[in-house]
Protein backbone atom coordinates (compact mmCIF):
# COMPACT_ATOMS: atom_id res chain seq x y z
CA UNK A 1 0.00 0.00 0.00
CA UNK A 2 2.97 2.33 0.38
CA UNK A 3 3.51 2.34 -3.40
CA UNK A 4 -0.20 3.04 -3.96
CA UNK A 5 -0.20 5.90 -1.47
CA UNK A 6 3.00 7.33 -2.98
CA UNK A 7 1.56 7.14 -6.50
CA UNK A 8 -1.53 9.07 -5.39
CA UNK A 9 0.62 11.65 -3.58
CA UNK A 10 2.73 12.26 -6.71
CA UNK A 11 -0.26 12.70 -9.03
CA UNK A 12 -2.20 15.91 -9.63
CA UNK A 13 -5.39 14.53 -11.20
CA UNK A 14 -7.20 11.25 -11.70
CA UNK A 15 -9.52 9.44 -14.09
CA UNK A 16 -11.47 6.71 -12.32
CA UNK A 17 -12.80 3.95 -14.59
CA UNK A 18 -15.40 1.65 -13.10
CA UNK A 19 -18.16 -0.75 -14.01
CA UNK A 20 -21.45 -0.55 -12.18
CA UNK A 21 -22.20 -3.49 -9.88
CA UNK A 22 -25.49 -3.49 -7.96
CA UNK A 23 -25.92 0.26 -8.45
CA UNK A 24 -22.41 1.04 -7.21
CA UNK A 25 -18.75 1.04 -8.18
CA UNK A 26 -16.52 -2.01 -8.08
CA UNK A 27 -15.75 -2.89 -4.45
CA UNK A 28 -12.03 -3.24 -5.11
CA UNK A 29 -11.92 0.32 -6.49
CA UNK A 30 -13.85 1.72 -3.52
CA UNK A 31 -11.53 -0.10 -1.12
CA UNK A 32 -8.44 1.26 -2.89
CA UNK A 33 -9.84 4.80 -2.77
CA UNK A 34 -10.74 4.51 0.92
CA UNK A 35 -7.25 3.34 1.84
CA UNK A 36 -5.76 6.78 1.15
CA UNK A 37 -6.88 10.15 2.51
CA UNK A 38 -4.61 13.22 2.61
CA UNK A 39 -2.93 12.29 -0.68
CA UNK A 40 -6.26 12.79 -2.52
CA UNK A 41 -6.90 16.25 -1.06
CA UNK A 42 -7.36 19.22 -3.40
CA UNK A 43 -6.82 17.31 -6.62
CA UNK A 44 -9.09 16.94 -9.66
CA UNK A 45 -11.01 13.77 -10.56
CA UNK A 46 -13.00 12.58 -13.56
CA UNK A 47 -15.04 9.43 -14.12
CA UNK A 48 -15.59 6.89 -16.90
CA UNK A 49 -18.15 4.18 -16.25
CA UNK A 50 -20.04 1.41 -17.94
CA UNK A 51 -23.13 -0.56 -17.06
CA UNK A 52 -26.84 -0.92 -17.71
CA UNK A 53 -27.39 2.82 -17.21
CA UNK A 54 -23.95 3.73 -18.49
CA UNK A 55 -22.62 3.27 -14.99
CA UNK A 56 -24.17 6.58 -13.93
CA UNK A 57 -25.18 5.29 -10.49
CA UNK A 58 -21.65 4.14 -9.69
CA UNK A 59 -20.34 7.58 -10.66
CA UNK A 60 -22.92 9.26 -8.39
CA UNK A 61 -21.58 7.28 -5.45
CA UNK A 62 -17.94 7.93 -6.37
CA UNK A 63 -18.61 11.68 -6.64
CA UNK A 64 -19.87 11.70 -3.04
CA UNK A 65 -16.79 9.80 -1.91
CA UNK A 66 -14.53 12.13 -3.90
CA UNK A 67 -16.02 15.21 -2.29
CA UNK A 68 -15.52 13.74 1.18
CA UNK A 69 -11.87 13.05 0.30
CA UNK A 70 -11.50 16.71 -0.76
CA UNK A 71 -11.12 15.75 -4.40
CA UNK A 72 -12.67 18.13 -6.92
CA UNK A 73 -14.77 16.05 -9.33
CA UNK A 74 -15.29 17.65 -12.74
CA UNK A 75 -18.85 17.95 -13.99
CA UNK A 76 -18.37 15.98 -17.20
CA UNK A 77 -18.02 12.21 -17.27
CA UNK A 78 -18.18 9.43 -19.85
CA UNK A 79 -20.95 6.84 -19.53
CA UNK A 80 -20.88 3.72 -21.70
CA UNK A 81 -24.17 1.77 -21.85
CA UNK A 82 -23.45 -1.95 -21.62
CA UNK A 83 -25.86 -2.69 -24.51
CA UNK A 84 -23.79 -0.53 -26.82
CA UNK A 85 -20.58 -2.06 -25.49
CA UNK A 86 -21.74 -5.62 -26.20
CA UNK A 87 -22.97 -4.71 -29.68
CA UNK A 88 -19.51 -3.56 -30.63
CA UNK A 89 -17.77 -6.64 -29.24
CA UNK A 90 -20.13 -9.11 -30.90
CA UNK A 91 -19.06 -8.41 -34.44
CA UNK A 92 -19.91 -4.73 -34.48
CA UNK A 93 -17.56 -1.95 -35.46
CA UNK A 94 -15.40 -1.39 -32.37
CA UNK A 95 -13.71 1.64 -33.95
CA UNK A 96 -17.09 3.30 -34.52
CA UNK A 97 -18.02 2.67 -30.91
CA UNK A 98 -14.81 4.25 -29.71
CA UNK A 99 -15.29 7.19 -32.08
CA UNK A 100 -18.67 7.88 -30.44
CA UNK A 101 -16.84 8.37 -27.13
CA UNK A 102 -14.20 10.74 -28.50
CA UNK A 103 -16.19 13.96 -28.12
CA UNK A 104 -17.46 13.41 -24.56
CA UNK A 105 -14.11 11.94 -23.48
CA UNK A 106 -12.20 14.85 -25.00
CA UNK A 107 -14.42 17.40 -23.26
CA UNK A 108 -14.05 15.58 -19.94
CA UNK A 109 -10.25 15.42 -20.27
CA UNK A 110 -10.06 19.12 -21.21
CA UNK A 111 -12.08 19.95 -18.09
CA UNK A 112 -9.92 17.66 -15.95
CA UNK A 113 -6.70 19.22 -17.25
CA UNK A 114 -7.98 22.74 -16.53
CA UNK A 115 -8.92 21.85 -12.95
CA UNK A 116 -5.72 19.86 -12.45
CA UNK A 117 -3.59 22.88 -13.41
CA UNK A 118 -5.69 25.29 -11.34
CA UNK A 119 -5.58 23.11 -8.24
CA UNK A 120 -1.86 22.41 -8.62
CA UNK A 121 -1.21 26.16 -8.66
CA UNK A 122 -3.50 26.67 -5.67
CA UNK A 123 -1.81 23.88 -3.69
CA UNK A 124 1.63 25.35 -4.44
CA UNK A 125 0.59 28.84 -3.31
CA UNK A 126 -0.92 27.45 -0.09
CA UNK A 127 2.32 25.71 0.92
Model-flagged regions — what are they?
Residues 1-72:
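Helix-loop-strand module that forms the ligand-binding subsite of alpha/beta enzymes
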